[in-house]
Amino acid sequence: MIKEYKIKSLILRQKFKDHKKFKKQILNYWKEGSDEPFKIKDDYYNDKLEKSDWPLANNWDRPWIKYAAPSIHQHLKLFAQHLGYRDIKLHKLWYQQYGKQDLHNWHIHDGSYSGVYYIELDKKSPTTEFLYADNPKKSFTIEVEEGDMVFFPCYIMHRSATNQSKKRKSIISWNTDFNNIQKQYLDNRPKIDRLKK
């Protein structure tokens, strides 16, 4: 029999600084790009996106990446430091645009933490939906608005449900790992809690 031990795992949210200016520039880059609709339908996936550059997620030479990656990294570094780490390493960075009826079904990511930056988000568009780790038959969402970044553990099952809005939804997503623990925690000798059998 598998014994469960509940531990706290955090999901973080923060506004992206200068979102309006950043949004305008990013959308121009994507409009000028040659990315195409993204569709997967098999025994596992049934995803449909208006546009995405996911197949190029580890290519750091894309024009929008050269513009966006430094600012995104700075925001992600703040999340990492909030969790007790010194810095963060971006492995993959990509965008997704959802038209009406588009969907990115249940999935997970590789790495330590992933997340979503909501570039365009209508009030009728779905936000990221998560499954509880201790009860995957129940889901939850977080109250967010356009311009928010949400940072969450890669292992949490999540999706973007079908977009019912007539307005497009646009996001940036990433896969990351942490670099080094902050010194204050290395020298710390906390009281140890023993989890019962």
Segments from the language model and where they lie:
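Catalytic core of non-heme Fe(II) oxygenases with the double-stranded beta-helix
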Residues: 87-161, 168-171, 175-189
